[in-house]
UniProtKB/Swiss-Prot annotation:
Protein name listed in UniProt: Glucan endo-1,3-beta-D-glucosidase ARB_01444
Catalytic activity: Hydrolysis of (1->3)-beta-D-glucosidic linkages in (1->3)-beta-D-glucans
Location in the cell: Secreted; Secreted, Cell wall
Species annotation: Arthroderma benhamiae (strain ATCC MYA-4681 / CBS 112371) (Trichophyton mentagrophytes)
Gene3D superfamilies linked: glycoside hydrolase family 81 endo-[beta] glucanase, Golgi alpha-mannosidase II, domain 4, Immunoglobulin FC, subunit C
May provide specificity for triple-helical beta-glucan: annotated segments: 798-800
Superkingdom assignment: Eukaryota
Physiological role: Cleaves internal linkages in 1,3-beta-glucan. Probably involved in cell separation after cytokinesis.
Binding, (1,3-beta-D-glucosyl)n: H658, D727, E729, E733, Y811
Spans annotated as Disordered: 136-187
Length: 909
């Protein structure tokens, strides 16, 4: 992967440093670190950081392979940039970057200064000379393995840090929204999936702390659990100046931005034609581009007030799973305010003014603003055309019903009456008169929240419903549905669709729907799926042949005799969980599928002891209960001050990955020994409540921390500000979590949890194949991108076909494969796997699997079992198998069983 790409006329940073990272599964140093001798002279060197804020230089995990050699080594992140082809420094992202100049450029002409000298193209955090609105700040600590203490390639520099001022804390009461709350949605037929998990107290051996590294300074009345991984988090994190993506709109606090000269709320909507793309990959069929990114910071409209100046504050109120409120005040504690209800999919951007003079601005510039009458009583409509030829509608609903008589002052400002109380709404209109008619009928109404209900029937059909809470005039709501919603609408909801669509940043076209609820249906849920290998459509459990059993017995002794404590008692919840689950799957295979209980007995007892260490909270880095945001987190950051320890666990990164492995391990332990459940059930339920709670009234944990029921998948990023929004890299570990709670629910007797896991798997099977796993006929991602087959890392604002730990194809594709589990063939369709294999890993393809080295090779061949179980079996059963190709979080025992389970004929050695 090239560390930079020059695009004429484009000044866009694509930096993986600013995002939440995902740990890789045990590649070796040689896989990811290139020396100068290995690189061609023409290829720019990767940038290696000597130290990154938030990334520990300690070796977090060194489990031995069967020969006793480490199978994971710390390695650097490959960094990628889109930079300038002229005038470096003219526009600066406030993150580490590399300016590439033309040969004729003079360093002294740069507006970027580094360490007191003009920028000469070195990687750095910019200190912008003469641009006060751009602040220096350090990248958010990210989830990738620690950087090596000695750089092995490329440039070296020490990262800078700065602490942003959190700003004043709002102390006045929350601005009220006149709501029309709906009754809790009625439970649908079948098993209710949102029943409370047993509400045990936090175990006494998990200490409570009130000093979380990230303060809730910008949240109003932060008393109960606060959602940490949701779409609006940028509004209360860092400088509060990164974008929030409501889909299809984007919102950003202007906060004195010089382009808009405003402290109001900026709104934009990006068309596909505005995207920037990366370089084509000529090694893949179709030469797909490596990434695409939507521009941020376009301020098509800004809803502000003349009173909003340098003293303006923004706070967030009522943060929920689907909604929140962003509140602007002229000064902290002021009763005058503008309140913005934030709800995923909202058709209007709504601003509720309380005694302020509206100032509606545009950095794109107004070409035409014309009054357009009153579509409803008390509503005043204006039609706006901007200089980019885009059409917007503006509706004013004064509390007193009087004509606001908005005035256009130049091409940047529309002013309203002083002391205005009422509602102003804006919406982009892509559909001319038809679009106007749709918006006109719903103007004055706005969503304030979404209530969700759901059930799963015994026939394998799951249903979930969004009931929109609203306020205002009472008209039916305009809400935008993503493609996976539209695909799964029931018949009644299909009738709410309108002939109006707006593009989203990374999920295709959103469809306008008019109504106060949606109901989605997922059929063919994997109710029969258990711990054994499983095939879609199968209603029975796999029985292994005698040949397969004998082959597994022959290798079981080596793996089950490994030092379990050494591989599970680690200073990382993530890697400890992977180690525990590795042994759990192997023990289950030997005891239940092979039928050798004697061989499994000793390792089973060892696994119980290893798990008990965590239940007793005596692992290397114990858990604590965070009493600020409300959750169970690693104590590492509290003790060492490094927010990147255990990949940001303390700041709620990736809890569904980390805790999912523990939950799945517990499900297997409880299956193998039901008596084990009594002493351990409360601990495991605590992990489920933290990462994926089923209710919103639990005093200890928020509802559904990771899984986003609107987007249909999880977000991995926690309390880190991010210019491109939330993101997720490993779809397969997302499905692992859903499978884990399904199986823990089954083992522990929680029917609601089991049903919820089944429905989550069904939703994931749909969303992953719409947005992440791209078959040739995918219509939601750009045609020039789908040849990559997987997204790599999907953000709310961009998609980059890479990983946080390297750009080898086996890394990028493989992180969407592991861990191989019974659910893998359900969410990774055979059609997709076949297309991906032929394009990437077949003999003669871009990266033939037979030439891959290390643990990724085993991941690829285990994945091959979905379409060619015979070839997969032969690879793992070969007597001369290179054991280093078995990932440290997997076992040969399970890989053999998985291939045999998918193989429909008798396996003879």
């Amino acid at each position: 992967m090239k560390p930079y790409t020059t695009l004429p006329g484009v000044a866009v940073l694509v930096s993986l440093l600013t995002q939440s990272a995902h740990a890789a599964p045990f590649p070796s140093r040689a896989d990811v670190v290139h020396t100068r001798e290995q690189e061609s002279a023409a290829r720019p060197q990767p940038i290696v950081y000597k130290h990154e804020r938030g990334v520990s230089n300690e070796i977090q995990y060194l489990p031995p392979d069967p020969q006793g050699h480490p199978t994971i080594i710390p390695f650097p992140t490959h960094i990628s940039y889109v930079t300038f082809n002229s005038r470096p420094g003219a526009i600066h992202p406030p993150y580490p970057h590399l300016d590439i100049s033309e040969a004729s450029f003079k360093a002294e002409d740069s507006t970027c200064w580094y360490r007191g000298k003009p920028c000469e193209g070195v990687p750095h955090i910019p200190i912008v000379k003469g641009f006060d609105s751009i602040e220096k700040r350090s990248p958010a600590p990210q989830r990738h393995p620690p950087a090596p203490t000695k750089a092995t390639a490329g440039y070296q520099f020490t990262n800078c840090t700065s602490t942003s001022n959190p700003g004043p804390t709002a102390t006045s009461p929350t601005s009220g929204i006149p709501s029309q709350p709906s009754a809790p949605p009625a439970t649908m037929a079948g098993q209710d999936i949102f029943q409370p998990i047993a509400k045990d107290p936090i175990p006494a051996n998990i200490k409570s702390r009130d000093d979380h590294p990230v303060k809730a300074n910008h949240i109003e009345n932060p008393t109960g659990p606060i959602s940490t991984n949701k779409f609006y988090a940028n509004f209360f994190l860092g400088n509060q100046t990164s974008t929030t993506f409501t889909h299809p709109y984007t919102m950003i606090w202007a906060k004195g931005d010089k382009n808009a000269s405003s402290f109001g709320m900026a709104i934009s909507h990006v068309e596909p034609s505005q995207r920037a793309t990366g370089e084509p990959n000529n090694k893949l069929p179709g030469n797909p581009v490596r990434y695409y990114i939507n521009p941020v910071g376009i301020k098509s409209l800004v809803l502000s007030a003349s009173e909003l100046k340098e003293s303006t504050t923004m706070s967030v109120a009522k943060p929920q799973a689907f909604s929140a409120q962003a509140i602007l005040r002229p000064t902290g504690g002021s009763s005058e305010s503008i309140t913005f209800p934030l709800v995923q999919g909202m058709g209007f951007i709504t601003a509720i003014y309380n005694n302020l003079q509206p100032a509606i601005q545009s950095a794109v510039l107004f070409r035409k603003v014309e009054p357009a009458g009153s579509p409803q009583g008390g509503i005043f409509k204006y039609k706006i055309t901007l200089e980019d030829d885009k059409n917007w509608l503006l509706y004013v609903i004064p509390e007193n019903g009087a004509d606001p008589k908005l005035k256009l002052e130049g091409n940047k400002l529309i002013s309203g009456p002083t002391g205005f109380k009422g509602v102003i709404q804006v919406a982009k209109n892509p559909s001319a008169e038809e679009g106007e008619g749709i918006y006109d009928k719903s103007a004055g109404s706005y969503a304030t929240d979404i209530k969700i209900s759901g059930s799963v029937g015994t026939d394998g059909t799951g249903t979930y419903k969004f009931s929109f809470e609203k306020a205002g005039k009472g008209a039916p709501l305009v809400m935008y549905a993503l493609p996976h919603h539209v695909e799964s609408f029931d018949d009644a909801t299909k009738n709410t669709k309108k002939n109006m669509k707006l593009s989203t940043t990374t999920k295709g076209m959103a469809t306008a729907c008019v109504g106060d609820s949606w109901t989605m249906v997922e059929g063919n849920l994997p109710l029969s799926m258990d711990f054994a290998p499983w095939k879609p459509g199968s209603s029975s459990q796999v029985t292994l042949s005698e040949g397969a059993k004998n082959a597994i017995k022959a290798v079981a002794g080596n793996e089950l005799s490994q030092d379990m404590e050494l591989q599970t008692n680690l200073n990382s919840m993530y890697f400890s969980g992977k180690g525990l689950n590795k042994f759990a799957g192997a023990i289950y295979t030997v005891q239940e599928l092979v039928g050798d209980k004697a061989a499994a007995s000793g390792p089973l007892n060892s696994l119980k002891e290893s798990f008990k260490r965590f239940v007793d909270n005596k692992q290397q880095i114990p858990l604590v209960y965070d009493n600020v945001w409300k959750g169970v987190v690693s104590s590492g950051t509290y003790e060492k001050g490094d927010t990147g320890l255990d990949f940001g666990n303390t700041l709620y990164n990736d809890h569904h990955f980390h805790y999912g492995y523990f939950i799945l391990t517990a499900a297997i332990l409880g299956k193998l020994d039901p008596a084990w459940l009594d002493a351990n059930k409360a601990y495991v339920n605590m992990l489920v409540r933290d990462s994926g709670n089923s209710v919103d009234n639990d005093e200890h944990f928020p509802f559904s921390r990771a899984f986003d029921w609107y987007h249909g998948h999880s977000w991995a990023k926690g309390l880190f500000e991010s210019s491109d929004g939330k993101d997720q890299e490993s779809t397969s570990e997302d499905t692992m979590y859903a499978y884990a709670i399904k199986m823990w629910g089954k083992t522990s007797g929680d029917k609601s949890m089991e049903a919820r896991g089944n429905l989550m798997l069904g939703i994931l099977a749909r969303t992953l194949n719409n947005y992440f796993l791209m078959k040739n006929d995918n219509v939601n991602q750009p045609k020039n991108f789908i040849g990559n087959k997987v997204t790599g890392i999907l953000f709310e604002n961009k998609i980059d076909h890479t990983t946080y730990f390297g750009a080898n194809l086996e890394y990028i594709q493989g992180i969407h494969m592991l861990p191989l589990l019974p659910n893998s063939a359900y969410t990774r369709s055979a059609e997709f796997v076949k297309e991906e294999w032929e394009a990437m890993f077949a003999s003669g393809a871009a990266a033939p699997a037979e030439k891959v080295t290390g643990g990724w090779k085993g991941v690829l061949y285990a994945n091959l079992a979905i379409i060619d179980p015979e070839a997969s079996w032969k690879y793992f059963a070969q007597p001369s198998l290179d054991l280093s190709s078995i990932d440290g979080g997997a076992s040969r025992i399970w890989y053999l069983a998985y291939a045999a389970g998918e193989y429909s004929t008798y396996i003879a050695l």
